[in-house]
Design a protein with these regions (language model features):
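PLP-dependent aminotransferase-like
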Residues: 39, 47, 90-149
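Conserved beta-loop-alpha segment that forms the PLP phosphate-binding cup at the N-terminus of a helix
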Residues: 51-65, 69-97, 108-111
């Protein structure tokens, strides 16, 4: 790791951290800002909640909106993408008899949220080697007269693809589209949310934007704002979107209050120049791993995320969830924080690049992988 950058975080130096995209990493300075926000509440709870919190939350919300390039009155703070998905499903009153289209590359909890409401999650299937038009066609074919919503990932979690969300939205009109943008804020340059033609867009801030966990931003198109309400009804009841999301009972708001500090850390670490540096590092690192495993480079098709990439594992490795879990345990025991993924009967290794990584991290992984895979050759 780049020791000078790693020291800004609290990461265990005994581990090689190559999975920043999963839960992010909070810089020490941001955690300290969150601690100060908590302490301010403890010193004078009544004043903090009644007098100071509303304006502070409005400022944090405005900072988050500006970071993803949307006006302050168009985006609410939520705790994570899962909450944002639940908010949209509830606000649209999705229920039994309804269908919601998800994709075979989508994060599973979106389908679970659909099913929890008694609706059917219909899967649009496309392959790792397909082209963007195959994604659009697959989603459009999955839409029926009972489809109430399409949920499509902007960057797919298991496969690190950047999906053509604008083209999907155009193809399925007038069906509303919710974009799961969990991996997007701070990681995908050139983003113009309002130009995508989608209805809802929700992205985590803790993954690539260095905020504390439990901070995400939910953007809603104008024609839906009157009907979108938080899952908890409390003191913000009756306020227009997005202020209606600010006060949902007595909860710990410190993650939201530290959002401006996390975004400041993103800029201080290099902003988009750092993302470009990480992307180039990841391409070289992934090639080191592919060379060590003797697996091919991916076919050019759907674009891949700047700071996430998957490497194909040899046949027979991590092809099932059980096999992937077994390999994960061996990797972690050897000091590597990198997730194997079982996807459509294939074993993949998802790599990430963050400011604290250097090329040595990937070279160490490449050197250690063959023996680790051999040690688990009899695993499921």
């Amino acid at each position: 790791m780049r020791r000078d950058i790693a020291d800004l975080f609290e990461l265990d130096p005994r581990l090689t951290h190559l999975n920043h995209g999963a839960f992010g990493a909070v810089p020490r300075a941001v955690r300290e800002a969150q601690d100060r926000a908590r302490s301010a509440v403890e010193r004078a709870p009544m004043r903090a909640f009644r007098d100071e919190l509303p304006a502070a939350l409005e400022a944090a919300r405005a900072a988050a909106a500006a970071f993803v390039g949307v006006p302050a009155d168009t985006a609410a703070l939520v705790r994570n993408v899962s909450e944002g998905v639940a908010v949209v499903l509830s606000s649209l009153e999705v229920g039994p008899g309804d269908e919601v289209v998800v994709s075979s590359h989508g994060y599973p909890t979106a389908a679970y949220a659909v099913q929890s409401r008694g609706a059917t999650a219909t899967t649009a299937t496309f392959g790792l080697g397909d082209d963007p038009h195959d994604v659009v066609d697959a989603v459009a074919r999955a839409v029926t007269d009972r489809t109430r919503l399409v949920i499509i990932d902007h960057i797919t979690s298991p496969t690190a693809l950047v999906l053509p969300v604008a083209e999907v939205a155009a193809a399925v009109t007038p069906v509303p589209v919710l974009v799961d943008a969990a991996h997007v804020p701070g990681a995908l340059p050139g983003l113009v949310v309002e130009a995508l033609g989608v209805d809802f867009w929700v992205g985590n801030l803790h993954k690539w934007s260095y905020t504390p966990r439990s901070a995400a931003v939910l953007w809603v198109a104008p024609h839906h704002r009157d009907r979108v309400r938080p899952l908890v009804t409390s003191w913000s009841h009756g306020l227009p979107f997005p202020a209606s999301f600010d006060l949902q009972g007595t909860v710990d708001h410190s993650a939201w209050l530290a959002v401006p500090d996390g975004l400041a850390a993103w800029h201080a670490l290099g902003g988009w120049q750092q993302v470009e540096r990480n992307a180039e590092l990841l391409r070289r690192g992934a090639e080191h791993v592919r060379t060590a495993l003797g697996t091919p480079s991916p076919r050019a098709g759907i674009p891949t995320a700047p700071c996430l990439e998957v490497v194909a594992l040899p046949p027979g490795v991590a092809e099932t969830p059980e096999g992937a879990a077994s390999l994960w345990q061996r990797l972690y025991a050897a000091g590597f924080v990198v997730p194997p993924v079982s996807f459509a009967g294939r074993g993949l290794l998802r790599l990430a690049a963050a400011p604290y990584n250097d090329e040595d991290d990937y070279e160490r992984l490449a050197d250690g992988l063959p023996a680790l895979l051999g040690a688990g050759s009899s695993a499921p």
